A protein has these predicted regions:
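C-terminal segment of classical bacterial N-terminal signal peptides
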Residues: 12-20
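Conserved hydrophobic/aromatic "anchor" residues
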Residues: 66, 94-95, 120, 157, ...
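Sec-dependent N-terminal signal peptides
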Residues: 5-12
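C-terminal capping alpha-helices of c-type cytochrome domains
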Residues: 81-104, 148, 173-197
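Gly/Gly-Pro-rich "capping" loops immediately C-terminal to redox-active cysteine motifs
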Residues: 26, 41-71, 77-82, 126, ...
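Inter-heme linker and motif-flanking segments adjacent to c-type heme-binding CXXCH motifs
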Residues: 42-43, 97-112, 131-141, 158-165, ...
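Sequence/structural segment immediately N-terminal to covalent heme-attachment motifs in c-type
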Residues: 21-40, 107-131, 146
Length: 197
């Protein structure tokens, strides 16, 4: 799962790191992000999330967390370090306004769906991530996100490696690794209705 992370760190930092963010246009800044998140919205590694069409405030808040060190990531920390508040707001708006890409992830098999739905009911994920897992202003969209990214994120909450949201840590600790895998596969294969409420 983590085999390519070291290579990505070199590519994203050595090649794409912004040196003078305030002097860069939004297109130049977005090109930096595309180094890992993909020029067409499809990330180059499945453990990296899609950010096209993701919620603006969520994107902005994650950049802030990386910048102040509350969320740890060797790739993201040096990328966001030189960004100003204006830069981060512009990037969040830019990516939020782009169309969510088709990541070509199939719907989960019936047995996986059954296991995922059984796990979802007591977790009440819809209570925060909305009826179709489309997210809201604060919470991210989960439907159609990268399978391996969802798996890694939920696993990190489960183990406590990621602890920025104590509520998520508690929820993920309440289920086992098999249920987490089923959830990731199920959510990754979901498509949103045309106008989700």
């Amino acid at each position: 799962l983590f085999r390519s992370i070291g290579i990505l760190v070199i590519v994203c930092i050595a090649v794409s790191r912004p040196h003078s963010a305030s002097a860069q246009s939004i297109d130049e800044l977005a090109t930096v992000c595309a180094g890992c998140h993909g020029e067409n919205g499809v990330p180059i590694d499945k453990t990296i999330p899609n950010i096209w069409g993701q919620k603006r405030y969520y994107l902005l808040n994650q950049m802030r967390l990386f910048k102040i060190g509350h969320r740890k990531n060797e790739q993201m920390a040096p990328i966001v370090e030189p960004l100003s508040q204006t830069d981060m707001e512009a990037l969040a708006t830019h990516f939020a306004n782009l169309p969510w890409p088709d990541l070509q992830q199939p719907a989960a098999a019936d047995d996986v769906k059954a296991r995922a739905r059984a796990a979802l009911n007591p977790l009440n994920c819809r209570g925060c991530h909305q009826e179709h897992y489309q997210g809201d202003m604060v919470r991210p969209r989960l439907a159609g996100q990268q399978d391996e990214y969802l798996l890694k994120t939920m696993t990190d909450f489960h183990t406590g490696e990621r602890n920025t949201y104590p509520g998520m840590v508690a929820l993920m600790k309440s289920i086992d690794e098999g249920e987490i895998k089923s959830l990731a596969t199920y959510l990754a294969g979901l498509k949103l209705p045309e106008h989700p409420k």
